[in-house]
Structures are given as structure tokens and as C-alpha cells.
């Protein structure tokens, strides 16, 4: 009896186990991708790409392809994440958090590892497999978005929703989204849905870091929707994406100007007459799609000031009327009228009237569309082109050609004209005898053979004047062409046409700059702050460094001003009385390391170490003195250079003029502006006084800078004044001085040496180069 009772229960349990075992492989990501548990990330990625290409719903029409593709995507999502993969290997579940402790999981894992419960049993809408079927046809993938959606956004705007699984807010906006998507799609707006769980790369590319998100795409530019998700806000958002100058409001005052612009713009002009005060969104979307071919205007027939316009074209004010005007503005070239203007009706109407009756070839794209390359015999199209000029001289020929084009409209014929002076290469290639057609118009019948520019053509033998005879000749050739395509016997290759209507470089640059500024402004206030943080960090860092430098410099200058009196007290009284400006320079120099100046004599013993083999970047400042002036000049020299002793690259020495006069005069020969050096026949040879000269010697680069004592009148002509002084820097009045040593104290010979040292450190002194250092005997 007990066995009988246990029999059905056992069979049910066995059946459940079999079903679970059968479903287990479908839930195992390794089996779904066909890889082993020890496979590397490269192998997993390779397997995913292969299976994704095989089971992609766009390529595989199998009814179960979408479910299989979702399983593949889920499996790759688990195995591509090391943490989820480790959880699955350990617990059979890819979740990041477990409901029980690891001990409990180990205890019960063996029991439940074969059981899988599908949440669809409870009809929860969170599983991607159970998402609304209305979204499935709008699903976007990264390659599809880049290759198709972005280029198509230059023809129509796109409204894109980013969603994910387990998103309660996504469920909340779903009814509104479905209604608006259906409504806007009928008007010509592109609709897209991105599942952030399976298209993480695309979601990141779009800048969507949370779900749900709604964004607009137009001209390749992304704009996020930030208002409440209601029908009116979404419609207004799409309308705001469109440029504001697509449709011009037309009244009795401006309709003639608007329609007459066909010649300047080289486009037909479209007018919509309606009793709605606001331009319909459908009309704006149509204007955006056809903006390269047509110009659009809107007439609100209920507005005062449109009576003349409505009366002239016999408009029914109760029915929307669409009119298209070409070369003649007194009457429309075509009319469409319907109580309910549908997108398909408008598209069919405009696609048949995209070009003027005899459009001017202003760029290569227009030429290729007017005269397409034949793909089959039935699609053969011949272009009749008038090569003419500008001005009243050619007006009659053009009007006659236009009349002929209007009277002979056929699907296989396209009429166009071109200005010879604006497209000289085109005209020269078709008119072999330029002298024959100089100052006249010519007609050419041509057929494009390939996209490389090869054409077959025939030029009318006589110039086009628009006479009846010319019309008969052209009409006869066109009739022959229908039966004998070989009539176009000449062939040539045409270069691409110049773009006559392209804006100037400055205008393009201005608009590009304006768009960039507007994008930055929009990004600053509406973009995700996570993306803006690097830019903001860089900006604030630059501002901090800039203002920090200014503040530190300001405090440094103020502290130097306060400290300068204390520095002056430490120096000698004689220095303070002589030159206050010199002290200001010294206070800003490097702080001396010692309380004295170490000055060594330059002799033949230390000559190599102190000059010839001096380290790169080091200089030896040498004072020239004699035995009689040694004490006074050394004291003054030490006082002048004291503030520069803190520099480790400067060395200080003195040279005895009595011992090494020839060495000094050899160096002075290389000083271009130095005083003439006497020779041995000069009676004043031994009377030249070089005491007080200072030479800054760079032993490594073999050059020196020269300081000469400040001289006055007589001797100044012989020895030369020190050109290294900048009189604009020192405006302190000086008394007249004699060049004779007896008339002026020796200590004044080194006057302003400190300023010369400043310029030496700045590198602004003149340099005198020598081939090699002479020996110091």
C-alpha cells in the first residue's frame, strides 16, 4: 500500500529530475559556447564571436535564433567576467552574492544543482526573453548603430531608449514609450532600443550609465532627454532636435522673394497651406530629410496677411495643400491636396519633384543624381546639357532651352545647364572647337558610363540660339537616340565639378566653432558628470596652479620689500651711500654661503684647473690688477661680487698685469669692440692701463665676456666706454670724472660691476670666442 502511494510521487520526482537534467546543458555557459572549463578568455571570446555571427537574428531566420542568441550572450556575459565565472564554477550560480553562507551552499548544492526554475512561470517581465515584442524590432547592435543608424541620422532624427533587465523604471515608462514610438515612427522619426545588459559597448559609447535613458540622435550628435517621460515632452524633444531654419513662414509680403530664390539656391521651393498656426512636425521632418534638394515654406491661411497669396493660387483653406514651384513662380509645377497628409503621400510627391526642370550643375553630387550611371538597358538615362554663360546676353538661349525641357519631359531624359566660366574643365572636355562656340551657347547630349567619369556624348554641330530650327534638330536627335544608342559616338573622361555653392572657409570655420561651443555648453550642463570629471579636474587644476603662482609671487614680492632694509644694514656704509639700486639687485640674488669672497690668483700652476679644464657650465671671473692697485681693487671687487658667491658655478680670481700683460692683450684682440691693442713700436706700449678690467672666462666653450672700467672724455676715446651698461636702467646722475687714475679713486673703477654680473648670469652679455686658450707664461 505504501509502495503504491510512493509510486506516483517517485515517478513525478524522476520526471522532474529528467527535465532538469535535460535543461541543465542549456543553462551551462560552457556548453552553450562549446568551450571547456579551462578555456582562456581568448578562446571564450573567439567562440562567442563565431556563435553570435551564426545565430544573430538579423542573419539567421530560424524561429529559435533569437532565443539562442540571447543564451549565447548570457553565457558570454558570465564567462567574460572572472568573478561571475568563479562563482559559477564554485556554486553553479553566477550571482555576486549568495543567499547562504559557503558552508550551507556546499551542504545543499548537491541537492539543488540539477533544478532550474524559470521566472517566466510567474510571468515576471524582468527577463529579457520576456520583454515586450514591440521593442524587439527596434533593438540596436554596435555595428548596426555605427554603420547604418549614424549615417541615417543625417536624413532623420532618432529617438533611442536604453533599457535593461530588472529595471522597474523601464517598466513604468513602457506604456508612454510604446505610444510615442508608434506615433513618431509614422511621422518619419527613427526609433531604437539598446539593451544595456547585452550591448554594454554601445551603451557606453552613447554615454548612458543608467537605465532607463532616452536620447536623441541627429546629424551624428547625441542629445539626452532630461524631462518627465510624457507624450508632449517627447514630441517637443524631437522637435527641438531639428534645426530652427528648416521652414520659413510665408505671407503676402515675402512670398515673391521666397519663390524667386530658386535661381540663387538652384532648388525647387515647396509651400504648404494649412489652417494650423504651428508648423506640423511631419512637415518639419520632411523638410529636414529633403533640405539638400528643396526649400520649404509654410503658409498659415488663417493669418491676416495671406489673403492675396491664397487667392492667387486658389487655395482651399479647409484642406491642406502642398505646392511645388520650379523655374516659374506664377504657377506651381505640381500640387498635392489631402485632408490627412500622410508621410508616404508627401514622400512620393517630393521625390518626383526634387530637381528643377533644367537645373544648373553646381557640384558633382547633383550631376551624379541627375545623370546616374546606367545599371541596365531599362534604367538608361540621357542628359541634355546646355553649356552657356551668365548675363542678359545668354538669357534668350536659356529661356528657349527651358521651354524645350518643359515640353519634352520624359523619364529617360534629364535637362540641365552649366556656366562655362564656373566649370571650365567640364566645358573644355565637351567642346573640342572652342573658337566656334566662344561667346555662344552649346547643347550636349551625354550618358555616364561609369563612376570614374567616363561618358559618351554628342555635341550639336551648331551653336544653340533657341530658334525653331535648333528645336527641330535637337528633337530629331533625341528621337534617333531612342532607337540607336550608338549615336553618342564620342567618349571622354570628365573631372569632378567644382562645388559652386560651398560656403567660404571663414564661414565654415565660424559655424564649426559655434557648433563646438554649443556642444561644450550642452555637455557642461546636461552630460553625465562621470564623463565630465576628467575635464573638470584638468580645468580646476590649471586654475589652481595659475592663481597659486600669482598669490605666491605676490607674497614673495611683498616679503622682499619688507626685508630689503635689513639687508642694507648688513652691508657696508660706503656701498649704501653710493648705489641704492645696486642693493636692490643684490637683495634678489642668490644668498651667499660664506661671509667672505674667496679670490685666488690665476698663475701658470693653477691655470689648467681654474680655466682650461673648467667643468661645463662653470665660469671664472678674473680681475686684472697691478701690484700698486692690488689692495684697493680686491676690496672693491669683493664688495661688488659678494652677493654672487652663492652660485657654485662661479669662481673668482685675479691676474697680475705686471706678469701676464701679453696674455691679456692676446685675448683682447678677439674683442671686436675693444680698444686697439698697441704693438711694440708704440711709445705708449707699456703705459696702457688695464687695471680694473674684468673677464668672465668660460673654459669649456672657449669664450669670454669683458667688463671695462667706466672712463671719461680723453681716455674714453682710446680705451672705449663700457658698452655693457644700459643707461635706461640707471638714471642716477653722475658727476664728470677724469680718465686718469690720479683724478679718481681706484674704488670707482669697478663701479657698476654688480650690474654687469647680473647680465652675465642672465646670458645677455656679448661673447668673444677664441680658437684656444693661450699659455700663461
UniProtKB/Swiss-Prot annotation:
One GO BP: regulation of autophagosome size
SMART domains given in the database record: DnaJ
Gene: DNAJC16
Organism ancestry: Eukaryota, Metazoa, Chordata, Craniata, Vertebrata
Residues exposed to the Extracellular side: 553-777
Function as written in the Swiss-Prot or TrEMBL entry: Plays an important role in regulating the size of autophagosomes during the formation process.
Keywords for this protein: Autophagy, Endoplasmic reticulum, Glycoprotein, Membrane, Signal, Transmembrane, Transmembrane helix
Keyword Signal carried by entry: yes
Signal peptide (from-to): 1-23
Key word Signal present: yes
Glycosylation sites: 627
Protein's name according to its UniProt entry: DnaJ homolog subfamily C member 16
Domain Thioredoxin: 117-243
Domain of life (superkingdom): Eukaryota
InterPro entries on file: DnaJ_C16_autophagy_reg (IPR052448), DnaJ_domain (IPR001623), DnaJ_domain_CS (IPR018253), DNAJC16_TRX (IPR043361), J_dom_sf (IPR036869), Thioredoxin-like_sf (IPR036249), Thioredoxin_domain (IPR013766)
Skewed-composition ranges (Basic and acidic residues): 559-580
GO cellular component: endoplasmic reticulum membrane
Domain J: residue ranges: 28-92
Main localization category: endoplasmic reticulum
Cross-referenced Pfam families: DnaJ, Thioredoxin
Amino acid at each position: 500500500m505504501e509502495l503504491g502511494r510512493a509510486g506516483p510521487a517517485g515517478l513525478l520526482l524522476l520526471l522532474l529530475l529528467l527535465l532538469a537534467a535535460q535543461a541543465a546543458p542549456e543553462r551551462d555557459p560552457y556548453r552553450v559556447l562549446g568551450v571547456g572549463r579551462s578555456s582562456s578568455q581568448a578562446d571564450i571570446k573567439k567562440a562567442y564571436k563565431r556563435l553570435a555571427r551564426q545565430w544573430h537574428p538579423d542573419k539567421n531566420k530560424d524561429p529559435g535564433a533569437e532565443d539562442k542568441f540571447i543564451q549565447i550572450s548570457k553565457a558570454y556575459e558570465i564567462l567574460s567576467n572572472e568573478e561571475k565565472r568563479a562563482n559559477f564554477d564554485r556554486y553553479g550560480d553566477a550571482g555576486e552574492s549568495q543567499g547562504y553562507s559557503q558552508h550551507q551552499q556546499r551542504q545543499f548544492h548537491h541537492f539543488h544543482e540539477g533544478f532550474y526554475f524559470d521566472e517566466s512561470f510567474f510571468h515576471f517581465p524582468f527577463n529579457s526573453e520576456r520583454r515586450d515584442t514591440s521593442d524587439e524590432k527596434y533593438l540596436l547592435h554596435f555595428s548596426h548603430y555605427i554603420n547604418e543608424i549614424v549615417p541615417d541620422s543625417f536624413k532623420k532624427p532618432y529617438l533611442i531608449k536604453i533599457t535593461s533587465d530588472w529595471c522597474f523604471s523601464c517598466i513604468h515608462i513602457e506604456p508612454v514609450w510604446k505610444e510615442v514610438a508608434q506615433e513618431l515612427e509614422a511621422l518619419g522619426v527613427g526609433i531604437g532600443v539598446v539593451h544595456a545588459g547585452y550591448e554594454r559597448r554601445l551603451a557606453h559609447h552613447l554615454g548612458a550609465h543608467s537605465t532607463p535613458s532616452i536620447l536623441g540622435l541627429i546629424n551624428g550628435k547625441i542629445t539626452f532627454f532630461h524631462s518627465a517621460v510624457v507624450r508632449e515632452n517627447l514630441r517637443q524633444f524631437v522637435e527641438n532636435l531639428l534645426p530652427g531654419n528648416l521652414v520659413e513662414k510665408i505671407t503676402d509680403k515675402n512670398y515673391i522673394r521666397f519663390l524667386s530664390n530658386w535661381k540663387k539656391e538652384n532648388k525647387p521651393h515647396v509651400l504648404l497651406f494649412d489652417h494650423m498656426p504651428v508648423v506640423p512636425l511631419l512637415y518639419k521632418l520632411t523638410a529636414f530629410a529633403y533640405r539638400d534638394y528643396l526649400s520649404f515654406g509654410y503658409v498659415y491661411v488663417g493669418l491676416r496677411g495671406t489673403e492675396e497669396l491664397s487667392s492667387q493660387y486658389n487655395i482651399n483653406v479647409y484642406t491642406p495643400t502642398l505646392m511645388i514651384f520650379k523655374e516659374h513662380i506664377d504657377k506651381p509645377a505640381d500640387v498635392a491636396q489631402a485632408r490627412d497628409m500622410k508621410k508616404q503621400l508627401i514622400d512620393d510627391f517630393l521625390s518626383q519633384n526634387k530637381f528643377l526642370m533644367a537645373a544648373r550643375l553646381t557640384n558633382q553630387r547633383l550631376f551624379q543624381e541627375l545623370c546616374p550611371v546606367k545599371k541596365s538597358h531599362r534604367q538608361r538615362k540621357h542628359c541634355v546639357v546646355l553649356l552657356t554663360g551668365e548675363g542678359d546676353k545668354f538669357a534668350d538661349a536659356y529661356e528657349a532651352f527651358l521651354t524645350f525641357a518643359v515640353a519634352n519631359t520624359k523619364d529617360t531624359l534629364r535637362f540641365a545647364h552649366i556656366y562655362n566660366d564656373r566649370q571650365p574643365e567640364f566645358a573644355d572636355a565637351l567642346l573640342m572647337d572652342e573658337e566656334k562656340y566662344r561667346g555662344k551657347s552649346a547643347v550636349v547630349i551625354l550618358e555616364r558610363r561609369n563612376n570614374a567619369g567616363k561618358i559618351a556624348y554628342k555635341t550639336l554641330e551648331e551653336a544653340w540660339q533657341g530658334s525653331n530650327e535648333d528645336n527641330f534638330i535637337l528633337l530629331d536627335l533625341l528621337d534617333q537616340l531612342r532607337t540607336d544608342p550608338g549615336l553618342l559616338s564620342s567618349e571622354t573622361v570628365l573631372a569632378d565639378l567644382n562645388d559652386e555653392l560651398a560656403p567660404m572657409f571663414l564661414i565654415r570655420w565660424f559655424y564649426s566653432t559655434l557648433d563646438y561651443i554649443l556642444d561644450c555648453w550642452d555637455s557642461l550642463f546636461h552630460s553625465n558628470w562621470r564623463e565630465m570629471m576628467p575635464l573638470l579636474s584638468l580645468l580646476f587644476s590649471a586654475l589652481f596652479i595659475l592663481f597659486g603662482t600669482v598669490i605666491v609671487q605676490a607674497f614673495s614680492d611683498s616679503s622682499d620689500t619688507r626685508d630689503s632694509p635689513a639687508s642694507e644694514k648688513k652691508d657696508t656704509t660706503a656701498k649704501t651711500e653710493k648705489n641704492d639700486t645696486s642693493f636692490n639687485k643684490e637683495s634678489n640674488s642668490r644668498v651667499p654661503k660664506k661671509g667672505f669672497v674667496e679670490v685666488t690668483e690665476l698663475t701658470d700652476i693653477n691655470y689648467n684647473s681654474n680655466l682650461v679644464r673648467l667643468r661645463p657650465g662653470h665660469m671664472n671671473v678674473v680681475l686684472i690688477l697691478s701690484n700698486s692697485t692690488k689692495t684697493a681693487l680686491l676690496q672693491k671687487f669683493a664688495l661688488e661680487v659678494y652677493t654672487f658667491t652663492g652660485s657654485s658655478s662661479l669662481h673668482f680670481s685675479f691676474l697680475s698685469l705686471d706678469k701676464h700683460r701679453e696674455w691679456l692683450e692676446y685675448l683682447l684682440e678677439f674683442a671686436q669692440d675693444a680698444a686697439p691693442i698697441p704693438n711694440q713700436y708704440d711709445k705708449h706700449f707699456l703705459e696702457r692701463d688695464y687695471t680694473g678690467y674684468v673677464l668672465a672666462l668660460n673654459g669649456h666653450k672657449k669664450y669670454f665676456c669683458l667688463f671695462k672700467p667706466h672712463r671719461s672724455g680723453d681716455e674714453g676715446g682710446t680705451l672705449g666706454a663700457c658698452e655693457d651698461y644700459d643707461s635706461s636702467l640707471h638714471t642716477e646722475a653722475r658727476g664728470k670724472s677724469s680718465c686718469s687714475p690720479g683724478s679718481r679713486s681706484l674704488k670707482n673703477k669697478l663701479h657698476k660691476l654688480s650690474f654687469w654680473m647680473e647680465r652675465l648670469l642672465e646670458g645677455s652679455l656679448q661673447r668673444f670666442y677664441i680658437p684656444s686658450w693661450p699659455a700663461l707664461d
